[in-house]
Amino acid sequence: MPREEFPGEPTGHPGRHLPDDATASTATPASGRSPTAAPASGRPRIIALDVLRGFTLCEILFANIQLIADHGTAVVTQPMGDWDPWLGLPIFSLLFGIGFTLLLDSAADRVSRPRLVLLRRLVALLAIGLVHVVLWPGEILTRYAVVGLLVLLPSSWLPRWAVAGLAAVLVPVALWGGGGPLLIAGLFLLGSALARYGVADQIERSIRGPLLLGLVLTAGAATALWAHGQMEAGADPMQPSFTSSLADLLIAGVVVCALLVLLRTPLRPVLRVVFAPLGRMALTNYLTATLLVLAATHVLGLPIGQSLQVAFLAAGAILAAQWLLSALWLRRYRQGPLEWLWRWATWARRPPSSRVGT
């Protein structure tokens, strides 16, 4: 399954209005806004989530550019052999669950029916995905929207301990079955649970937690890779095993922890400049990347589907152009053009101007 995903729009702080979240309310006081307040957020963005989204968006394009170019029919050569190193699915699925819960909590401050806001958001995402799938059959927006409607939205009525418990069951079951929509559902729920327990609010404040967790995940990934090597003889190379899927998931966790640690070092400004603009305009960049890849293939005639070297050079050029345009756009506007339209559909009213300074 192609590893490409798009997360939600995480801003603000979680946990005040969802079931069984009373303990989280002390971390962030109620805003006191009227339920009819305009859908404009005054809460600060969580920069780490923007950086993670931007980093994973880059990985997505490198992982899928040959498939996009050949309409999903290319035989993609993995740079590291039979082991598939692409990590977009677990990272972005986790971010989608976090972003969904943060936005639901934000909506609860502003409207009397916050889940209706999220329902509109997911339906709009489904509509976008159904258009996008014509260009790129392997796109993930439709699956994210469907799993969100069937699993993530109903889970908002559950207490956070139940959401965490469901995630703890679904993720290993999905790994045993080779991934797919069940893994997306499990990671959505895991992200939602992390947000509702306040973890998303703390990731900017601590280096010890991500560092220790990263070391544990590294040990687990090394063990899973060793076990996969022991079991590889006689196994079907086209069928992912539990150990290889587990290793993918744990390595994705290591990457997340490593980025969170680096964001607490002098490299933070560099990471923010490089990845945050891409992450803040993730939907716009995700969709326009498909158009640019198809144009490079069918208009310019680049052999992206036949040459891994050409594919990676093209991906790098596309990301560089998107970074430049994103950085320039965000100097004048608070969000990307498609993000603004998605917000319009989410709140069922025209958002206020997204110009900086208005």
Segments the model singles out, each with a brief description of its role:
Residues 2-358:
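Alpha-helical transmembrane segments and their immediate juxtamembrane cytosolic regions
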